[in-house]
Amino acid sequence: MQRENFKSRTGFLLVSAGCAIGIGNVWRFPYVTGENGGGLFVLFYLAFLVLMGIPVLTMELAVGRASRKSAVLSYKTLEKPKSKWHIHGWLCMIGCYLLMMFYTPVSGWMLDYFYKFATGTFKSGMNSEQVSGVFNDLMASPVEMIIWLAIIVVFGFFVCSRGLQKGIEKVSKVMMVALLALIVILAINSMMLSNAGEGLSFYLVPDFGKVKNVGLGKVITSAMSQAFFTLGLGIASMEIFGSYMNKDRTLYGEAVQICALDTFVAIVAGLIIFPACFSFGVQPNQGPALIFVTLPNVFVNMTGGRIWGTLFFLFMTFASFSTVIAVFENLVAFLTDTFGMSRTKASIINGIIMFFACLPCIFGFNIWSDFNILGKGVLDLEDFVVSNLLLPIGAMVYLLFCTTKFGWGFDNYFEECNTGKGLKLSRVLKPYLKYVLPVLIVIVFVQGFIG
């Protein structure tokens, strides 16, 4: 069966950016920026995005476009006879399943909060205990979380079952355009609040005193880690979209566009969070506490807060769901490519697997709340394995596969990367890609354990 292509370049860019843009852009990037010197951190982040993120992204896309296959078969198509690079393809699929085992339930939380703001569960004037109580009640109710999980899983795999152009590309285009419009509207509203200037200063103005306290080395390694992790590279989440590309555009140019969209959302998210928090005297933090406790506390005390809260969680639903359907597509393509299944059958099987695989994460907040390994609950443990092990190790494998004679080889990668119109990768960068970039990835890997 002939492989589908994206209907348009815009579709490819929005689907790929949707995969990269996710919860971390909102609940991690702004906080890490503020804590690490503001504007100076952003400059380091952008530098490492160019030095690390874009090159590895081109490698995933190159393997996909050259092979026209999903992760496992892409290695088998391009590797030398009797080599074992395709083992990493299987690890990529394990990583995608593991990522969705905790990411899908969290996407359900976003949808739940959108519903609760829209229907008036959050009322003007609620105190902080009442706001926290809504989140605590959700965490204590496996039934409620399972309902939202089921909605995300069913709708996500239904979109994938429709095919590339009629399903994921069509839906992602609508969601991403709406997401970009929503984030701009929300940022403008936040920047018009009373003490917005203080929040913007904390967020973006370089604070050399804070850099001195934190340590320049810590700022640099934090920027390096954020630039690496923001794209989710190493488990073939982007490789699959390379396999649907045509040869019209260079991969380096397309990678720059994807990273630009991802960075835009991450930076503008901070323009929502910090002005709002400083205007209402709330300490900005990170993670679930920021999204589900701190910001709802702001919204319930804001004029028109129900509307702004509804729009914010609609934005967060789109941000998380765009990643969900992108990775779901990888899982569906894995079964269709590797085992010759139809899209419908692959979507149904994956939907059943994913629903039950997500239950441990949900139960980890209530009936299995005593479970921990090395002090980590179910969600944190799954996140640690994906983020600190599978992503950096996987990125290193893609790097070695594309730059060494034992893998696909630099010349093949270079030719694929530069095929088409657009920005070209310079051959001068070969020594950097072969000898320096691996060292940077090792630093990220080590930093993940130290941090």
Language-model segments: which ranges?
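A generic transmembrane alpha-helix motif of multi-pass inner-membrane proteins
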Residues: 376-400, 422-451
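Hydrophobic alpha-helical segments of multi-pass membrane transport proteins
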Residues: 320-326, 347-365, 380-414
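Helix-loop-helix connectors at the membrane interface of multi-pass transporters/channels
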Residues: 3, 107-140, 243-248, 253, ...
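Select transmembrane alpha-helical segments in multipass membrane proteins
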Residues: 5-16, 41-44, 83-97, 147-152, ...
